[in-house]
Amino acid sequence: MTIVFQLTMFALIAISFLLIIGVPITFASPDGWSSNKNIVFSGVSLWIVLVFAVGILNSFIS
């Protein structure tokens, strides 16, 4: 169970870094938001799911 928690935590950190870098680039690029908003929304949705997954898995680890 610990390895699942660690992999989920790693995925959360990786998606967080991608969003930190990707969202400002999307907003700064010309016509970036209208052509890439589905990707941004998918990334944010995945991030929210991972936050809840880490919270649930943490209750099994502790």
UniProtKB/Swiss-Prot annotation:
May control the interaction of photosystem II (PSII) cores with the light-harvesting antenna, regulates electron flow through the 2 photosystem reaction centers. PSII is a light-driven water plastoquinone oxidoreductase, using light energy to abstract electrons from H(2)O, generating a proton gradient subsequently used for ATP formation. It is a multi-pass membrane protein. Keywords: Chloroplast, Membrane, Photosynthesis, Photosystem II, Plastid, Reaction center, Thylakoid, Transmembrane, Transmembrane helix. Pfam families: Ycf9. GO terms for biological process: photosynthesis; photosystem II stabilization. This is Photosystem II reaction center protein Z. Belongs to the PsbZ family. InterPro entries: PSII_PsbZ, PSII_PsbZ_sf. It comes from Welwitschia mirabilis. NCBIfam families: PS_II_psbZ. The keyword Plastid applies. It is found in: Plastid, Chloroplast thylakoid membrane. The chain crosses the membrane at residues 8-28, 41-61. The keyword Thylakoid applies. GO terms for cellular component: chloroplast thylakoid membrane; photosystem II reaction center. PSII is composed of 1 copy each of membrane proteins PsbA, PsbB, PsbC, PsbD, PsbE, PsbF, PsbH, PsbI, PsbJ, PsbK, PsbL, PsbM, PsbT, PsbY, PsbZ, Psb30/Ycf12, at least 3 peripheral proteins of the oxygen-evolving complex and a large number of cofactors. It forms dimeric complexes.
